[in-house]
Amino acid sequence: MAGGRVLRRIGDPVVAGAPVGVRIRTRIHPTAAESEALSAIGNLLGSVYRGELAGRVGLRPLDRQAHGLWRAQRKQALTAVSSSRWAGAITRTVEDQYQLGMRSVAAHIAELRAAIEVLEARCVLRPGELAPVDGDQDSNSRGRSRRRRRGYGSAAERFTKTRRLAALRQRLTSAQEALAAGRPSITVGGKRLWRNRNHLENTDMTEQQWRKKWDAARMFLTADGESGRTGGNETIRVDEAGRLRIKTPAGLVDRFGSHLVITAPVAFSHRSSEWAARVNARAAVRYDISYDPARGRWYLDASWKSSPEPTPALDELRGGPVLGVDLNADHLAACVLDASGNPIGEPTTIAVQTAGLKASHRDGRVRAAISRLLDLAGQQNCAAIVVENLDFADARATGRETLGRGRGGNAGFGAPSPAFPPAGSGPGSLVWRRVVGSR
């Protein structure tokens, strides 16, 4: 207790493990004819994928036995229009997308309930009225401090909030029905791009530009890796010389032959030696081909599972110096700390200016800041980077209802929290292991 208030509970620190996968990207430089063939293959497989996804949503949740039977039947049916390997990738991706949709509905329900709880607590009060003092009001289930709730500033604001509360309740009912029925709402190509079609006047796209983006986002050019096969993938293969070969679906063999070979060789820059070692060892490598219509560029992504080193124990990391990091809206404040938590040397400020930038630019700025943190940790021989888990995911669920209006109320949303995902259920310290050379 401090002045009658319950302080925020500090959670136990956890060590974030190293990533268990690798993904690298390079450009493809196809000719006009090869680009046309890639588009035709992607559009055909995309159409098949969307049809299978719609059918899978209609089946609702399946147990293990029923799912195995469904996938075997669909793979056999799809082989006639694609190939056995394309059919395997499509059915696997369909199931992954369905499960992701179900998890998204469950997460959406949790966010709606949190927002409704906040609105209900304030809407029951008259404008300007203070909630009565109650022991249950001092702290919530997450252990955070809670002030006495106050009613909204005016009757007009309260009326607006009651309308929003009714809308959220309606959305919650719809989401709960979708979850119970096992029918998530999935938009292949992205709901944001779909909404842009209905509001083109508010975007910088013409209808033709939107159509190109929409068609590109709905293509399917994903091939799962196969261990023991040449190059680690028989569907999309890249050999040691960089020659890219794509297996043509059965429905397009008459036009493009059994395989489409890209004339210009491809080359990976980042982690190229690891990729080459897997190709030579015939280890599984997954490939994804995508198209950016705004730039007119084709991209090839290679991904595979990695074998990270065991996560070190927390006591082991505490033995040496660590780099403590404080997250702020426009910068990261870092300082080297000894084993007792005392600062060593001068603190460092790393600017992270993301206001007004596109999502891709914001992501680049945050990645650059993380790279500087890793470099600083390496220069100071720090065993780990320690950053507080501020639990911004929970704040975003109820922030519109609790943080108030204007720039002051929304200042907390400027912190680059997506780059520092929470690893625990409650606020606390998140310890990141420093990996030399990782970016």
Give short role names for the model-derived ranges.
Residues 1-439:
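Nucleic-acid substrate recognition interfaces
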